[in-house]
From Swiss-Prot:
This is 5-methyltetrahydropteroyltriglutamate--homocysteine methyltransferase. Its EC number is 2.1.1.14. One of its GO terms (molecular function) is zinc ion binding. It catalyses: 5-methyltetrahydropteroyltri-L-glutamate + L-homocysteine = tetrahydropteroyltri-L-glutamate + L-methionine. The gene is metE. Catalyzes the transfer of a methyl group from 5-methyltetrahydrofolate to homocysteine resulting in methionine formation.
Length: 765
């Protein structure tokens, strides 16, 4: 027997039915007061803590809650507030907090980017002239709240100082250690206040440790955690890593902390190898992340128990902690909200609450013996077996098509330089052609009509008539704005991935499988539970209708395989590359159907390509090769005069520019406005031979850009990109924006474009 401890690393903020999102948006819209927002979110927070307590979790995280983002929380804790928000130096108000994330009329929002290789976004700290001081010990507040309200001796959670600073901008390698030295005393102040309040454990997240970095940077962690240990020697610090294995395992496990949290799920088997090769300090706790915190499939508890038993051989008898691989922020709350799912699929699922059950079962099995949870282990065993052996996962036609891939063409017939001439001949677009990325605002009326249709309150005919009316209205708006290449607006779609999941075999949508993407923005990733196959035309009807309304080209709009993979919960019984190729083959048929029906500009979005990169650079090439292959599998069969577009979201592109080119899309649009200078510098250093649009304004903020701001962005881009290659577009889709601000921003974009276009035409003469 092993005396094990159960733990959690973080819990979803959204609520079972997105109550958190609704509370935030009511506050932003002025429908509730700050006091009402605080009361609503406190009730959600305590409910989540009580559930974890009732499930028998020993170490319950507190302070993982946020009103927007945990990295932004760290910034406001230490007073790292950009000057443009005119902070007065005291505790940061909730309005200022939201302004940093969302922007306001006279101050643009802080940059937002992906949290490691997930679809969660964090607000990037602006570290120039940073002078950290503890303005608000949020961790202390949440610790005392849990203790006083529920009697929970919680485990406060902090973003570690090295990771926080590495995620920021405005400091270089030379100033990094100087900046770190400023933050260490501020963190110590937080830790001392927690210790004084009675905290026993503190979880400090340092996922940067799971990335690829120079070994000399280990000295940064040694400095930080020695200082922490010297200041609060009796406080048990759990140094938490996740999303990958540790390149410097020996150095990390010997840092002066009470516990080290290691990911045994997303580590490619490296963590157990390192443990066996180097052992583990007997005076430390090993917090073993064995339950997948990023996916929704039920664990093979027999295999997990065997792994934990193996791990236990290398850890002191009372120092094994059982936990998820990472915070459960990345999965929905509970599968109990999905009673209508197929029984076999439902049985194979495990959302946040069920993962806590799995942790409790494994902890009890270690402590009291497997026989004490024999029924639970058998139930899990049968559920996993039923799903794996079901017809859902054994489509022989799809498997035969995958086996025949070597006979499928994945290259366009003509190279770009030749086919672009054919495209220009019929498109006849002006210099700096304008377009949008795909979606237009989904008004309350759009959402209500869709909800009524789903509930059966209106007929299919009534719903389709409404979608056509809205599409026609926005085609007219685009023509009036004088946009060159139009889109149909995607009013029939709830989400750019979920919509395709509803039409392809092997996918299953959920009702309440929501996860946070950024701020109050929630997404509902489909479940890819089985073999993926094309069953019906997905986008043709809406695209053809939109094209019938205008002489201007209308883009067909699809989502590419890797983004569908990265924004779905993907089956874990086959390699993701196999699933991506199944999706690619299915979408290839949709692309061909669009072309066959007269749609000659087809956008296949790959916004999540960069975010899915493995954290270890040694694994990059295979991932990128697989991504290029599945994209070309989707697009290569079109005629030479059909123009393929693609779109990518927030990313650092300098290290994958060759991959972007290898996709062989005729036009790429990139979301860049919050980090415009960095993206432009990439194109100053490389020669990109295809056509490209760099987003000229930020759509994640309700703020309407000025014409001069857009022109500045255009002119900066044209320093690095040939005018004949350059397209002009917003950063991203406009679904989440309101109609007045959308039209106003597009008017400014078109005005800015025409003025710059005129300047260039004069120069050409």
């Amino acid at each position: 027997m092993v005396k094990a401890i159960s733990s959690n690393l973080g819990y979803p903020r959204l609520g079972e039915k997105r109550e958190w999102k609704r509370a935030l948006e009511k506050f932003w819209n002025g429908a509730i007061s700050e006091e009402e927002l605080l009361a609503e979110t406190k009730a959600l927070r305590l409910h989540a803590l009580k559930k974890q307590q009732d499930k028998g979790i020993d170490l319950i995280p507190v302070g993982d809650f946020s009103f927007y983002d945990q990295v932004l929380d760290t910034s406001v804790t230490f007073g790292i507030i950009p000057k443009r928000f005119q902070h007065d130096g005291g505790k940061v108000s909730l309005n200022t907090y939201f302004d940093i994330a969302r922007g306001k009329s006279d101050a643009v929002a802080s940059e937002m980017t992906k949290w490691f290789n997930t679809n969660y976004h964090y607000i990037v700290p602006e570290l120039a002239e940073a002078d950290p001081k503890v303005l608000d010990n949020r961790a202390l507040y949440y610790y005392e709240e849990a203790k006083n309200e529920l009697g929970i001796e919680g485990k406060p959670v902090l973003v570690g100082p090295v990771t926080y600073l590495k995620l920021g901008k405005g400091s270089d390698a030379e100033s990094f250690e100087i900046l770190l030295d400023k933050f260490i005393p501020a963190y110590i102040e937080i830790l001392k206040e927690l210790e004084t309040a009675g905290a026993t454990w503190v979880q400090i997240d340092e996922p940067y440790l799971a990335t690829s970095f120079d070994k000399k940077e280990i000295a940064l962690f040694e400095k930080v955690y020695k200082a922490f240990h010297d200041a609060v020697p009796n406080l048990k610090i759990e140094l938490q890593t996740y999303f990958e294995s540790l390149d410097y395992y020996e150095e990390v496990v010997n840092l002066p902390v009470a516990a080290v949290g290691i990911d045994f799920v997303h580590d490619h088997g490296d963590s157990i190898k390192a443990l066996k090769a180097h052992g583990f300090p007997q005076n430390k706790y090993l917090a073993a992340g064995v339950i997948d915190g990023r996916n929704v499939w039920r664990s093979d508890l027999d295999a997990k128990l065997a792994l934990l038993t193996d791990i236990a051989h290398y850890v002191a008898e009372d120092k094994l902690i059982v936990q998820p691989s990472n915070s459960l922020l990345h999965v929905p709350v509970t599968k109990l909200s999905e009673p209508d799912l197929d029984e076999v699929i439902l049985g194979g699922l495990s959302f946040a609450d069920q993962k806590l059950d799995e942790i409790a079962i494994l902890t009890k099995a270690l402590t009291e013996g497997a026989e004490s949870v024999a029924a639970e282990l058998n139930e899990a065993r049968e559920a996993v077996k039923a799903l794996n052996e079901s017809s859902h996962r054994n489509n022989l036609e799809v498997q035969a098509a995958i086996a025949n891939l070597e006979n499928v063409r994945v290259d366009r017939e003509l190279p770009f330089a030749e086919r672009i001439k054919l495209q220009h001949e019929w498109l006849k677009l002006p210099l700096f052609p304008t377009t949008t990325i795909g979606s237009f605002p989904q008004s309350p009326e759009v959402r209500k009509t869709r909800a009524d249709w789903l509930k059966g309150n209106i007929t299919d005919a009534e719903y389709n008539a409404f979608i056509e009316k809205e599409t026609a209205r926005w085609i007219k708006i685009q023509e009036d704005l004088d946009i060159d290449v139009l889109v149909h607006g995607e009013f029939e779609r709830t989400d750019m991935v979920e919509y395709f999941g509803q039409k392809l075999a092997g996918f299953q949508a959920t009702k309440f499988g929501w996860v946070q993407s950024y701020g109050s923005r929630a997404v509902r990733p489909p479940l890819i539970y089985g073999d993926v196959a094309f069953t019906e035309e997905i986008t043709v009807k809406e695209s053809v209708y939109a094209q019938s309304l205008t002489k201007r080209p209308v883009k067909g709009m699809l989502t590419a395989p890797v983004t569908i993979i990265n924004w779905s919960f993907v089956r874990d019984d086959v390699p993701e590359s196999v699933v991506a190729n199944q999706v690619g083959l299915a979408l290839r048929k949709e692309v061909e159907a669009l072309e066959r029906n007269g749609i000659k500009v087809i956008q296949v979005d790959e916004p999540a390509l960069r975010e899915g990169l493995p954290l270890k650079q040694a694994r990059w090439q295979k991932y990128l090769d697989d991504a290029v292959y599945s994209f070309k599998l989707t697009t290569a069969s079109v005629q030479n005069d059909t123009q393929i577009h693609t779109h990518m979201c927030y990313s650092d592109f300098d290290d994958i520019i060759d991959t972007i080119s290898a996709l062989d899309a005729d036009v790429i649009s990139i979301e860049t406005s919050r980090s415009h200078g960095e993206i432009i510098s990439t194109f100053e250093e490389v020669t990109y031979d295809k056509e490209i649009g760099l987003g000229v304004y930020d759509i994640h903020s309700p703020r309407v850009p000025t014409v001069s701001e857009i022109q500045d962005n255009i002119r900066r881009a044209l320093r690095a990109i040939d005018a004949k290659q350059f397209w002009i577009n917003p950063d991203c889709g406009l679904k989440t924006r309101k109609e007045p601000e959308t039209i106003a921003a597009l008017q400014d974009m078109i005005k800015a474009t025409k003025e710059v276009r005129a300047e260039y035409q004069v120069l050409e003469k």
